[in-house]
């Protein structure tokens, strides 16, 4: 049962109004951050803000007539409890017969739409493989993927800022190896692969 007094019901309706004003058919809200961190900073807890789900893995899709949370087996019970009264449906992943977000959008939400479909994503937090999967799911049909990383800023008035915590250096008594030694080994590895550089994006790496 959807509870009209539920704060998340109101937030989802606000997202839908914003979508209408921008000509967006569906918005995909990532539960990750630009570094694909398992535990993102408060600024990127967009899924929690919009539907109340606090699990570490989950993405939300909102259309004008459906809102759904995609999460895996670790969080099924938690999701059912936290989504109660929000009107957000639980879509289970990592199970036989799962329907991933791109397939659901193409084959269910907009199966009868042959005109252009506009999808909003946070391009900073979605990997290129996911964008490719979206495009492939729609095949020859027209789909516009809009990169709107700060779309919720218009609604999330007290959204936390990007963290500016000072960087600290851990001593060798904790790391077991100096920074220079690690960089030296990494450069030797790069040379051995005949590469010029390596891109490291995960914060814990």
Features from the language model and the residues they span:
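N-terminal accessory/capping or targeting/presequence segment of soluble
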Residues: 1-110, 122, 126, 130-205
């Amino acid at each position: 049962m959807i509870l009209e007094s539920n704060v998340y019901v109101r937030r989802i309706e606000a997202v839908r109004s914003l979508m209408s004003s921008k000509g967006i058919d569906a918005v995909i809200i990532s539960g990750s951050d630009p570094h694909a961190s398992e535990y993102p900073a408060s600024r990127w807890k967009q899924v929690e803000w919009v539907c109340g789900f606090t699990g570490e893995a989950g993405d939300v899709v909102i259309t004008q007539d459906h809102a759904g949370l995609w999460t895996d087996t670790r969080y099924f019970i938690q999701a059912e409890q936290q989504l109660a009264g929000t009107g957000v449906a639980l879509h289970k992943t990592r199970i036989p017969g799962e329907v991933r977000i791109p397939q659901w959008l193409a084959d269910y939400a907009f199966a009868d739409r042959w005109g252009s479909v506009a999808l909003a994503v946070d391009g900073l937090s979605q990997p290129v493989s996911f964008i490719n999967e979206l495009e492939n799911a729609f095949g020859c049909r027209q789909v516009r993927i809009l990169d709107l990383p700060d779309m919720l800023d218009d609604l999330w008035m007290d959204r936390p800022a990007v963290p500016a915590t000072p960087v600290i250096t851990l001593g060798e008594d904790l790391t077991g190896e100096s920074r220079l030694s690690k960089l030296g080994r990494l450069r030797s590895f790069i040379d051995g692969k005949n590469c010029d550089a390596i891109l490291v994006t995960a914060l814990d790496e």
